[in-house]
Amino acid sequence: MTVAATVLPAGEDAPAYRPRSYQVEMFEASLKENIIVTMGTGSGKTHIALLRIIKELESNPHKLIWFLTPTVALCLQQFKFLSDNIPAVRARTLTSLDKVELWTEQPVWDAILKEMQVVVSTHAVLADAMSHGFVKITQLGLMIFDEAHHCMRRHPANKIMQDFYHPALERHGAEAVPKILGLTASPVVRSNRQELLKIESNLDAVCKTPRTHRSELMTHTHRPHLQQILFTPVLLDDLQVGSKTLKALVSAWTSLRLEDDPYIKKLRKSPLDGRALQKVLESGKTYCNDQLKRFATRSLHIFEELGEWAADYFIHASIEQLKARAGNSADTMGWTDEEKAYLLDIVSKLPIPNIDLTHSDPDRIPISSKFRSLLEFLDTKGEPNFSGLIFAKQRATVSVMEKLLSIHPVTKHRFRCASFVGWSGGGSKDVLGELLDARMQRDTLSEFRTGQKNLIIATDVLEEGIDISACSVVVCFDKPPNLKSFVQRRGRARHRQSTYAIMFATDDESSALSKWEDLEQAMIEAYEDDERRLREAWALEAINEEVVERLEVQSTGAVLTADTAVAHLNHFCAVLPRQPYASNEPEFSYEKDDADLLRGTVTLPSCVHPGVRRIQGQRWWQTERAARKEAAFQAYKRLYEFGLLSDHLLPFKRNLELKETDLTNLPALVEVSEQYDPWVDWACSWSSPDVHQTRIAIKHNGDSRMCIRLTSPTSLPPVEPMTLFWDSETIYTLDFDKPKRMKEIAAESIENMRLATALYLQAASSRQMRPEQDFVTLFGPDLTDLELAEWLNKHAGDEPALEVYSRKDFPTVMGIVRDRSRYNEPMLFKRWVVSGQDDTPIVELECDAVPKRRNLLHRQTLAAKQPDSETPAISSKIRLILAENCTIDKLPYAETIFGRFISVILDRLEATLVATRLCETILRDLEFSSIRHIITAITAPSAQSLTNYQRYEFFGDSVLKFTVSCQLFFQHPNWHEGYLSEGRDEIVQNSRLARAALDAGLDAFIMNKMFTPRKWSAPLISEKISLTPKQRTMSTKVLADVVEALIGASYIDGGFAAAHACIHRFLPEVNLENIDRTTAPMPKDGVTNHTLNDDHLMAHIGYTFTNKSLLVESLTHPSCQFDTTTQSYQRLEFLGDAVLDMAIMSTLLSHPREIPQGLMTKIKHAVVNANLLAFFCMEFALTEKRTNVQVTPTGTVTLNPSTEHIELWRFMRYQGAHLQTARDLALSRHSSLRGSIIHGLKHSPSYPWKSLSQLNADKFFSDIIESILGAIFIDSHGNLAECEKFLERLGLLRYLRRILKDEVDVMHPRNIAQQMAKGEIRFEVLRVPNEGGGGGEDDGATYRCTVKMAGVDGVAVVVEGCLTSEEAEITAAERAVEILVGRGCSL
């Protein structure tokens, strides 16, 4: 699947947006009073309106905002601008395209405006709706007048103000009327001061133009070069030698007989229409007569303006159009069949002109002098990046000029032409001469913006407001009718070194010509005056003003002065967390007092706490330079006082708040203490023993077999039951009774127990026991002291096999058979085999080998093969041994096997004792309900035990990250996300945790030695007492892992309280319990409402915010600069990231099946994948009801209910066209990939890695998921269940459960390929710049991945043309897997 690439990368180098200072100045002025923003075309007036709308939605969300424009085209443009920048706003347009003139019932208007927030319409629509009482002035909270200079005389804009606004203002005061914001580039039409005052009075507003930032305004508005184009006008005689068709048309019209007109004939037939007939005969006006008159007049005008070929084309095309319309039965022009026939008869008699659209000889296309002058001018403007606009007076001229330029040899290969006449009806009632309709110009403006078209011919509809690309050439084919048109058209030429040309006839009256020359001179003088003021400003800036400010930190001697403050402030901002599409530069602005002195204000990036984000200077200065210095000094001083700088007056590079004395990184391997040996303590305890005994009940496949006593010199902790696997069919279960203290025990009894222990150990071994029998731990049968002595006498030692044979003992009471000819090899007795004569029999023993398994804690990996029931199996392990060479132990085999259990019992008992000692020392303040959790947490994987710390370490990692994140977030409300991340990283990094483990002495309790029963020997008192302490080498990662595993064990055993206590034990600086979390750090008061419908959004999220400001903050992107009281979502996203980890961890932990740590890590990596979160963000949509009006051809108005899906991403508050472009391209990819991703998530047995990599969503999509989680967590006072509800509604937890239930394969394709290839595979990803892209970061580069593997000469796989390196790697890996499968490889 091919998906469009994002042209602008969502990386760190993505362009940032920030409102220009003068835009902010005008926005802030609009909050204080009603104003008319007066700025040049292209200087960003609409951005000011956007900021004002957002502010009004926040502060007054229950009233309607009405955006008024003079044209339908401008309505559609402004609506698109608002929808693109505030995508979740409930907005609509009301124009003639909606046939609002037919909405004559109040319920229709009520339904349409219900729950609307912004309406964009023409002035006439609102004026008419108000005049009929459908819309009340009190419903409106803000009215925005685009092109505000129209608010004069009888214009609908002025009607709104005079008939409704001013009367309500006089009667009820300012609270009863909306606020006013006007936008204009030319506040006066006729350059009259009185008109300016009148407009201000009409709009109840004052004109404002940026003053403080005038130089910046001039920087962003480029003045064009004014040029005259002279032409010779058409003489009357030219018509006599010109077009035959035109002359015939004029003749046909002038020679019309009124009596032949179908309308006259109809009136003569009706006696009731005599009066009407008389009126028509006197005026001579009929439908057909008027149509022909206008057609002829337009044709003459075309001839005068463009020439003979143009007039012929216009006439011919119009006639062909008339014929098509006459044959269309669905045409609703209201003319009769007789009138159709009459007009067709007249025009059909005109001579057919010779229209050739493929002429290559310009001389064969007769044109006017005026058009020739235009061609000569355009011929000098054919630069590669040309973009032009030609204004013409009449719609007919526009359509024909576009065709003429498109086919003329001089221009057809140089210009890509289009026409635009707006969306009004124009001459829609004409059946002749109206060659343009709305459908033909639907894509004109967008094609011009993208460069598909580079020359537009338009009427004055493009003078005002319409957002089109800055042009290098603007031509007035007809003189501007007034100053307003002159200024508006001039504003379209905004390219650097652009040209603004006006066409003049050579016989133009000198007074008219001098008027434009005088105006041009006045403009030049005005430009020069601006430049003079700019030079004066630079001269003023050259004044040397000394700013005497100084801050000294006594503890370090660090000094800050006004001269160094700007550089320091720039450095502070430069090291802030970088975000795509957001600027990290400080912004300086200035205000003037009455004495023309300046005071500076600095605004820092939105990630900085609102308390210090905007700082104002304390003094007034003559120069901006001094004001900047002083403002920077005050800002940097406040940053220090706010705790965002170190005592060295530098941004924190290390988290000094942790007050750690040694944060140096440890080497990968360190020398640590040898593992704690509990047998040493027990050996010492035998000198003055406190004897305890516990009874071990042994069951064989569930049936009780025997009981053994374990004797220890000190108290014995509770020992959990053990399961031992003798073979594939035999399982022994060992249950340990509660230990009992023995009051007194005789030395003889101790000695007998040592003998019994030695007997058990020797019975199961072929090795000769050592003579020492001072065992640390003693075992014996469950007998009294007297019975034990008798038992030893009966079962100690062995006897010849022949004696046992002679007694005919039952096999069940026989012991181990030992072959003296083979070094007393132990065998299992099967049966006696007797051969030879009765007087000299040969007695043999059929024996089986004793199982060699020693580590009985693990199941056999391969079950023993079962013999066929009909064919006796002959095992190679069965042997016949002469009885005379054998001895048989007196200890029955049923008791002998216990000797094999002793090593396992002591190994598990040792682990229990180590864990118990750890609980009694380092973890003495923690209470664990089960020692099993501690054993698991301190057992390294290298021990190859039944359990190890890996699962617990996985859980502990999430709990630790979550706890530290919470503490830093609540403890440091002044820290931005960069400090929070750095602080967390320092606390949870392996070197810090390893150091904590060493400082606490935890290293001695980590069990990393593998249990090897064959090398095992029973611990002896004499050996243990003489041991000297040793050291061992251990990985710092193991040390850190055990700390995290103990945290995980604490959480599993006792929840968050236990986990927090465990964390505090190893990391004293982390003490979440002592931090007040009941009151969250709240944003400043002032933003109490979101820009959109909070209630609907919260209902869809599934959580109702007590503090809605948190919801606002969670949706505020770092590029959002207009709200300095709300911090960007980065802090909340930092916290939400940890909350998400906890939610996933909790789900994995609660799953009934115990999931291995490696698989849990893969699952977590898949579920928190940024592209998956982004996909859920794009899918998560609330449904809102809308009402649409449908007008039937008969004029009937019906209301049709509909629903609209509002996705979560639409609620994000942001600024900037580059972010908007990246967002829209990501959404386009989402639309293309949506089906495959949904199928993968719902049905696929594997994770949709490839489809998600192709989505390549910008990070802000996933960020707002995490920031909302953070906001819910804070507002709910740390209730994780509320966060999980949101994740459930989002669909994330539902998919996680499907992964677990259906065992979805989440392994990354690259890892699959590497495992299948046994590591003999190599991936190489290369970024391939687009040759025509200019080589920058946004050059449309693609990625290529090559794969090399063993057994393949050269490159095995090559993948090219991918949008991201991840997509390239995944695609290549999938192809590599296909090759490996073909070879027969498998995982």
From Swiss-Prot:
Domain Dicer dsRNA-binding fold: 565-659
Protein name as annotated: Dicer-like protein 2-1
Binding site for ATP: M39, G40, T41, G42, S43, G44, K45, T46
Feature type site, description Important for activity: K1259
Domain Helicase C-terminal: start-end pairs: 370-535
Gene: dcl2-1
Lineage, uppermost ranks: Eukaryota, Fungi, Dikarya, Ascomycota, Pezizomycotina
GO cellular component assignments: cytoplasm; nucleus
Domain Helicase ATP-binding: start-end pairs: 26-205
